[in-house]
């Protein structure tokens, strides 16, 4: 029987108390993450927003009438996406943001688990109305998609808690290291760019390591087969808080935005942005990020197609 790729609350409870899941000192400026997975199964809702609803183009056809179909990660990537106690309900900050957007637009939410490789084609082909996948706004992506921002994109370098590595903040710090990174991601571009600089300086090469299974990534770090993980800070901080087996040693060099992604020119990005701003103003947005330990990645206003990486 094929096992679910998700970490469920039942699995987590074997490691930690179900009432107080995490209260661990993280690496950045005394940040403390306190995440109660049991309580976080209860949805955070908001009301309809007339302005956002009025901005939906009259000609727009949703994938399923009356529903907002949003692609989210099919792999376990807490706090962004994981399964609840019933082993089927998607929870996490991405699902919570999706629900706030759907509520604001007066629609029922339909979440569709998908792979990172699938969302671009799915959006282009009209399989999904939008994707919430920790997608960073870049100049290249804006040529094909529209974006409504909902979070600051912070990247982090994480190592085994007993690693001798103390700092990764510049290209020479990754010289000769094996680093787990996602294919086709912003962090991969940064890592490969640093490697090119190191090659030009005659420094040892970095070896990117690509894994699609979270358990394999964790095992690779703990066994010493790889030196570091470079990816979304929210995911790295969650793992560090959950097990205490990893720690952050640096952040990525660029600050960008994570955004709800829609088909280019279909007119849906603006009403989504308005719905997010409605949630920001009434406090439901802050509730979502706070309860998933992402409070240091809040935005004060959602915007459509902001300057991105490469602009």
Q: How does the language model describe each region?
A:
Residues 117-118, 135-142, 191-199, 220-254:
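A ligand-binding cleft/hinge motif common to bilobed small-molecule-binding domains
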Residues 99, 108-173:
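Acidic, polar ligand-binding/catalytic clefts
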Residues 59-61, 93, 141-153, 247-250, ...:
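A structural signal for short loop-to-beta-strand junctions that line the ligand-binding cleft
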Residues 74-78, 88-103, 135, 154-213, ...:
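Bilobed "Venus flytrap"/periplasmic-binding protein-like clamshell domains
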Residues 110-121, 166, 206-219, 254-256:
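Short helix-initiation/N-cap motifs at beta->coil->alpha
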Residues 152-159, 237, 241-277, 295-311:
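Periplasmic-binding protein-like
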Residues 32-134, 291:
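Extracytoplasmic small-molecule ligand-binding "clamshell" domains
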Residues 27-53, 95-104, 163-165, 169-172, ...:
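Extended ligand-binding regions for polar small-molecule ligands
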């Amino acid at each position: 029987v094929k096992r679910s790729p998700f970490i469920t609350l039942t699995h987590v409870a074997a490691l930690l108390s179900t009432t107080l899941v995490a209260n661990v000192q993280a690496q950045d400026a005394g940040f403390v993450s306190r995440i109660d997975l049991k309580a976080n199964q209860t949805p955070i809702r908001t009301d309809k927003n007339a302005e956002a609803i009025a901005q939906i183009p009259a000609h727009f056809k949703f994938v399923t009438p009356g529903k907002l179909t949003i692609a989210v990660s099919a792999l376990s990537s807490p706090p962004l996406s994981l399964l609840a106690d019933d082993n089927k309900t998607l929870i996490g900050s991405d699902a919570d943001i999706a629900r706030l957007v759907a509520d604001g637009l007066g629609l029922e939410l339909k979440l569709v688990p998908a792979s990172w490789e699938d969302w671009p084609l799915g959006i282009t082909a009209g399989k999904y109305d939008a994707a919430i996948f920790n997608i960073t706004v870049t100049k290249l992506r804006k040529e094909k998609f529209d974006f409504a921002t909902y979070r600051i994109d912070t990247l982090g370098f994480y190592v085994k808690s007993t690693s001798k590595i103390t700092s990764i903040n510049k290209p020479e710090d990754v010289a000769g290291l094996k680093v787990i990174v996602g294919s086709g991601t912003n962090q991969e571009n940064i890592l490969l760019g640093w490697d090119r600089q190191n090659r030009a300086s005659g420094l040892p090469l970095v070896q990117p390591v690509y894994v699609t299974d979270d358990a394999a990534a964790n095992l690779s770090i703990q066994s010493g087969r790889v030196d570091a993980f470079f990816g979304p800070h929210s995911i790295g901080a969650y793992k560090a808080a959950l097990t205490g087996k990893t720690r952050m040693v640096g952040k990525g060099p660029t600050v960008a935005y994570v955004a709800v992604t829609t088909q280019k020119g279909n007119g849906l990005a603006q009403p989504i942005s308005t719905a997010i701003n409605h949630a920001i103003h009434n406090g439901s947005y802050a509730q979502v990020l706070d309860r998933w330990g992402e409070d240091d990645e809040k935005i004060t206003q959602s915007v459509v197609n902001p300057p991105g990486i490469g602009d």
